[in-house]
C-alpha cells in the first residue's frame, strides 16, 4: 500500500511540474524606409558596378548621371552627418566620377574609376562605415 501511495505521489509530482508552453505572438517586423541618400548610394553602387564591367570590356558607354549631384541635397538617414567634411568628400567623389567621362585611354579610365571608388571609401571610413567592404569590391584590378 505504501508503495502505491509513493507511486501515486510521484505521478502527481511529475504531472504537476510540467512546464506550460505559452505561445508568444511574434511581433511583426517593421521595415524601415530607406532614406533618399541611401537610395541614391545604392543607385551609385549599381552604376559603378556597370562602369567596372565596361572598363574591363575596354569601352565606357555611359554619360555622367547628373542626378548624382543630389548627393549634396538628398535627405540623410542621420541629418547630423552632413557636415563640412561630408560636403568636401561628396564633392571629391563627384569630381572623380565626372573625370571618368573625360578620359581617352583604358588605363586612364581605370585610374579615374579607382579614384572615384577611393573617394567613396574615404568618406565612408568617417561616415557610415558599414558599406566599406562592399565598396572595395568595386575596385578594378
Predicted regions: what they are:
Residues 2-8, 19:
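Sec-dependent signal peptide recognition
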Residues 8-10, 63:
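A periodicity- and composition-biased signal for non-globular, repetitive helical segments
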Residues 13-16:
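C-terminal motif of bacterial Sec signal peptides marking the signal peptidase cleavage site
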Residues 18-141:
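Sequence context surrounding c-type heme c attachment/ligation sites in exported
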